[in-house]
Amino acid sequence: MQPVHVWIRSESRGTERRAPVVPADVPLLLDAGFEVTVEESPQRVFATDEYAAAGATVVGEGTWTDAPHDAYVLGIKELPDEPESLHHRHVYFAHAFKGQHDAQDTLERFRRGGGRLLDIEYLTDTDGRRVVAFGYWAGYVGAALGVLQLTGTLVAPLGPMPKHELDAQLAQAGRSGADLLLALVTGGRGRSGRGAHAALVTAGVPVTRWDLRETRDLHKQALLGHDLLVNCVVTRTPTTPFLEPADLDHERRLRVLADVTCDVTGPTNMLPVNTEITTWDDPVRLLHSGSPEHGTAPLEVIAIDNLPSLLPREASEGFSADLTPHLLGLAEPGGPSAPWQAAGRAFDQAVDELEGSGGS
């Protein structure tokens, strides 16, 4: 039987330092008979030499286009714009199955080349629950940035750091009045919500946690009565949003949105008051200037779509620990394990919908 070949590509996004598989987990794949190739990367938080020492084959940056046809190409964020046709099996977060911006172009590239997109977001168990995610650290960083902004201690541009440095900033925020804030975490019991809660506790911020029951019957005034909203809700079907433009003119305490989910361009956006991401260089954008006579404060948003990369080492280690056992499932005798089959079905459905809509 031909060994499964996993090819860990470099990331094309300049601020992306995470890795889907860390050096410490490479031997687990090699011991299972896998072939592991790692591209050189000047920005990855783990040195290429660490992968070589773990037994991986090292190749040049961006050479995945010449990888063997049967290789699984692993990454984190979007592919570069070239080539126009994709013929490998790619594993990464594509954000292309819910009508997001550029989704059609991404799917077209796979359709032209005959490749397949196994989106990590759609690796799910038999109950439909995601089995791999960066959610905890996304929530942690998103909530942390919200607190720092509210206490006037957020400094741009942002850059990656170890967790102890971020925690020191949160502790300082706690001494700068964070305990007087009120924070609301939607999706508070999920991975991202738990991470957000942990960061807020570190800063000493009182936290309200809403989950499905509380958000199903939304209490809009209660939501507006918090200083910080950390949105950690992911939905695959359009539903009633938490905050709409008309809400911003009402009397409110709310001053900062930290949109961890960051599904800003699709129909499942739970915060349609914002339709653009923010960046490491400009992490905060003003959404509403406020109106003192109506009791409305200025409202700002933080909507960074790769939050965990601000803590790249911790985020990668946790993610790799979750993903590596499922990579082993690619070599099961009866074919790839259930989560990979689920991701494959999601891709097939997205392509069928593209063809049904008249995509070229």
Segments predicted by a language model, with ranges:
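Phosphate-coordination loops involved in phosphoryl transfer and adenosine-cofactor binding
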Residues: 3, 87, 179-182, 254
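Glycine-rich phosphate/diphosphate-binding loop of Rossmann-like nucleotide-binding domains
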Residues: 10-41, 153-234
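Short glycine-/small-residue-rich Rossmann-like dinucleotide-binding loops
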Residues: 77-78, 94-95, 233-238, 261-262, ...
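Adenosine-phosphate binding glycine-rich loop
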Residues: 116, 121-171, 262-360
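Phosphate/diphosphate ligand-binding glycine-rich loop within oxidoreductases
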Residues: 71-153
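Rossmann-like adenosine-cofactor binding region
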Residues: 212-295
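An N-terminal-biased, well-structured beta-alpha scaffold segment characteristic
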Residues: 2-109
